[in-house]
Structure formats: C-alpha cells, structure tokens
C-alpha cells in the first residue's frame, strides 16, 4: 500500500480547503443576519452560494479515502475495506482506488449484505483472489493490540 500517496494527499488538501471555505461561509452568514436581517437579499444570495458549494467528493470516493487513511492508522500493509458500499458507491470507490495506484484490497466487512458488494466488485472488473487473514493494529484504551481479521482479497483490474 502506498503510505505517502499523492493522490489521497491531494484529496485531503481539497477536503480541508472545502471545510475552511464552509466555516468562512457560516461566519459570513451570521454577519449578514446581524447586519441585514433574516429577510435580506444578501441572505438569500448567501443561501444560493451555500447550495452551490457542494462537497467535492461523492460518498464512494470518501469511503475509499477513509479506507486508505484507516489502513495507515492501523499500520496495515494492504488497504482494508471494512465498510459496506451501497450500489451507487461501488464504481466511485473502485475508480478512486485505481486512480491512487492501489492494486489490491482486502474486504473485511461482515454485514448481512456482503454478497451484494462481492458481486458488484466482480461487475466492476475486480478479481477475487481468495480468502486471507490480515493483521491490524488497534489502540484501545491506550493499549496497542494486534488483531487477526478475516477477509477476501481482490485485485483491481
């Protein structure tokens, strides 16, 4: 797994810029309310601006980033996906991993809808390489512990 992944680092930068702009917009909203009131044209314009300021990433992209960041925090040698993906998220998730240069990932989700994701991965061109066990490091109550986790390894084709 690429620990210093420029692709994901750029996502982080853009996300932080979005958050800073959102905080600034919220501060401006309060200034508009204080200076012009609730029924002002300025506040209506602010609402239009805020509605246009959509978060830059779809949820599948966010889940790919979170899987990468969490895998790094857990000191894993390979990307682990432990979350369920909705049908609308699968393509964005996999395209994001491909864009980041990730070649394989281990799917460890244990929800009742795992089969949906397995078939969706195959439909999007992934190859199931087989069952595997990975080791993750977690910090619980201040103690670092190693955990063996069962999963299915996929190759991104």
What are these regions (language model features)?
Residues 1-116:
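An N-terminal amphipathic alpha-helical segment
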Residues 115-129:
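Short, aromatic/basic amphipathic alpha-helical patches
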Residues 127-157:
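C-terminal edge-of-domain segments
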């Amino acid at each position: 797994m690429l620990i210093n992944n420029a692709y994901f680092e750029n996502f982080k930068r853009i996300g932080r810029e979005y958050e800073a702009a959102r905080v600034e917009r919220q501060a401006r909203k309060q200034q508009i309310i204080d200076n012009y009131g609730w029924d002002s044209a300025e506040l209506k314009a602010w609402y239009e601006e805020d509605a246009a300021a959509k978060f830059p990433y779809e949820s599948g992209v966010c889940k790919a980033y979170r899987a990468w960041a969490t895998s790094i925090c857990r000191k894993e040698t390979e990307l682990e996906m432990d979350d369920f993906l909705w049908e609308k998220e699968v393509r964005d998730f996999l395209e994001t991993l491909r864009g980041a240069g990730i070649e394989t990932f281990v799917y460890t989700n244990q929800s009742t809808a795992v089969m949906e994701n397995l078939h969706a991965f195959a439909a999007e061109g992934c190859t199931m390489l087989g069952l595997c066990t990975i080791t993750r490091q977690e910090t619980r109550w201040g103690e670092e512990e190693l955990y063996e986790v069962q999963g299915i390894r996929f190759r991104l084709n």
